[in-house]
Amino acid sequence: MTSQSSVISNSCVTMERLSHMMERKAWCSQESALSEEEEDTTRPLETVTFKDVAVDLTQEEWEQMKPAQRNLYRDVMLENYSNLVTVGCQVTKPDVIFKLEQEEEPWVMEEEMFGRHCPEVWEVDEQIKKQQETLVRKVTSISKKILIKEKVIECKKVAKIFPLSSDIVTSRQSFYDCDSLDKGLEHNLDLLRYEKGCVREKQSNEFGKPFYHCASYVVTPFKCNQCGQDFSHKFDLIRHERIHAGEKPYECKECGKAFSRKENLITHQKIHTGEKPYKCNECGKAFIQMSNLIRHHRIHTGEKPYACKDCWKAFSQKSNLIEHERIHTGEKPYECKECGKSFSQKQNLIEHEKIHTGEKPYACNECGRAFSRMSSVTLHMRSHTGEKPYKCNKCGKAFSQCSVFIIHMRSHTGEKPYVCSECGKAFSQSSSLTVHMRNHTAEKPYECKECGKAFSRKENLITHQKIHTGEKPYECSECGKAFIQMSNLIRHQRIHTGEKPYACTVCGKAFSQKSNLTEHEKIHTGEKPYHCNQCGKAFSQRQNLLEHEKIHTGEKPFKCNECGKAFSRISSLTLHVRSHTGEKPYECNKCGKAFSQCSLLIIHMRSHTGEKPFECNECGKAFSQRASLSIHKRGHTGERHQVY
């Protein structure tokens, strides 16, 4: 832990140094602008370059670092470069940044570098190698980088003096031209990057030490045949080719999951051990990787440094920005080899592939239930612990999942970001829009295996299946009546309480169910949006249309177990069964008379209350029953009631 703390501490110093340098950069830019306006002859301040703010490591240091320390190094380097680009510094992307973005190792062992690159040049004895290492080895302490400007090597072929650039923070002297190469050399370390074609020309500097001059300049000689990506080291190309080949030599002994990089395996193994060494000092949440902690901190600070150039939406993580940009481009580069389905994110493809393999490597320690995703295990564990870490600051309600919390917040804000392209109706949840779209497409993907009836929603199928099993788990404590759904029980209990929370804004009539209010309002509007494709008849309720369509198909899926009579509606079967049982569950509290149907009780109650809700629009006469109004209207139209 001491070594790790040292690296983290030193890296923090480096980030603080970057902060100071960025302040200096902004100040320098302002001063330069003022100098131009005032035509001051003062020498302008020098531009901050990537090398001024970078964090450098030797190859030896890189090999000795733990995976968490390497991840920290990657985060710091990438953020430093991003900040430079953000403030407008026109910098060419360094090779090390290119590698880090591809999640490749930025360095290899010095022995490999000497052995792989320019073997004709670097076959020198041990004494010369030590002298060369003295020239190119960097300062080992990250926090003690120094700027070396001492000129110690002279190339006699081109009559140029090269500085010993022993740190990534180099001299401000940009490039050094070599006439024989017709190329520019940034610093002496570039000599190590030449491939074949080098000419071994032994020169001597002012200290009498050997110095070799190269006659060719190839920085990235290794190219991937699959995607064309360039690499300066063959070892890096070999590692990269594993991505295309699908090679994953590092396998987890716990769950069998394989990785192309050893450090990724080490990080993964912490999932099984539960090790989370990096803890947030704000909320106490712990993480497996330091980079995850750094990203998490942005939740508390609100920092979102990555902005979309198309819509200017900002993100706390660069990966989220990259994924977001695919919304604008429509790019889905990750394709499933089994079914051809494409995804905009690689992680989604990986999770999708588990559907085909059936892989569920993550098991709950409490109940043994297995999951394909680690995040699913985390959420599942909260069902055992009762943990609800996401609390609404509006109403105090807490949630176990962040996604559910976000959806809940929309009930306060009224936000409905998911809009139907067919009718313009908006929804707060993506799943609600998906289900709604089936109204337009008539898609019913969920089919009952018992009777073949199909549904657009899975929950409707589950509810329907209880009809076949006879399961009614929700029982009324007042009358003992049982229901398939909890929502049906809640609505039923309003019969006992007399509660009618849904009132019509036109006539003031109240209802115990919202659906009844919606149906009632269509009386005022005359709206009948549901049309039969067979005969064109229109209905104000979708359910009525569905029942009507059974007339054309002759479908009668609900059969009486007593007499075998079949019905098109389950409600009709329920009423019919009462003719066998003699059940009359609806009793008048005025006179004690009982009825087998709720509608008959309602009509009967009007004899006590005198209510006559059905009024003739011709003469104003009112009736207690709709059927009576229909018969009465025939007197105005001259239509005669046919008796068969």
From Swiss-Prot:
Keyword Aminoacyl-tRNA synthetase, does the record have it? Answer: no
Q: Boundaries of each KRAB domain copy?
A: 48-119
Q: Where are the zinc fingers (C2H2-type)?
A: 222-244, 250-272, 278-300, 306-328, 334-356, 362-384, 390-412, 418-440, 446-468, 474-496, 502-524, 530-552, 558-580, 586-608, 614-636
Q: Which GO terms describe its cellular component?
A: nucleus
GO BP annotations listed = embryonic placenta morphogenesis; in utero embryonic development; negative regulation of DNA-templated transcription; negative regulation of transcription by RNA polymerase II; regulation of transcription by RNA polymerase II
Q: Which UniProt keywords apply?
A: Developmental protein, DNA-binding, Metal-binding, Nucleus, Repeat, Transcription, Transcription regulation, Zinc, Zinc-finger
Q: Name one GO molecular function term.
A: zinc ion binding
Q: Where mainly found?
A: nucleus
Where found in the cell?
A: Nucleus
**Which Pfam families does the record associate with it?**
KRAB, zf-C2H2
| SMART domains, alphabetized | KRAB, ZnF_C2H2
What function does the entry list?
Has transcriptional repression activity, partially through the recruitment of the corepressor TRIM28 but also has repression activity independently of this interaction. Essential during embryonic development, where it acts as a direct repressor of a placental-specific transcript of IGF2 in early development and regulates convergent extension movements required for axis elongation and tissue morphogenesis in all germ layers. Also important for normal morphogenesis of extraembryonic tissues including the yolk sac, extraembryonic mesoderm and placenta.
* Protein family per UniProt: Belongs to the krueppel C2H2-type zinc-finger protein family.
The subunit structure is: Interacts with TRIM28.
Q: What name has this protein been given in UniProt?
A: Zinc finger protein 568
| Gene source species | Homo sapiens (Human)
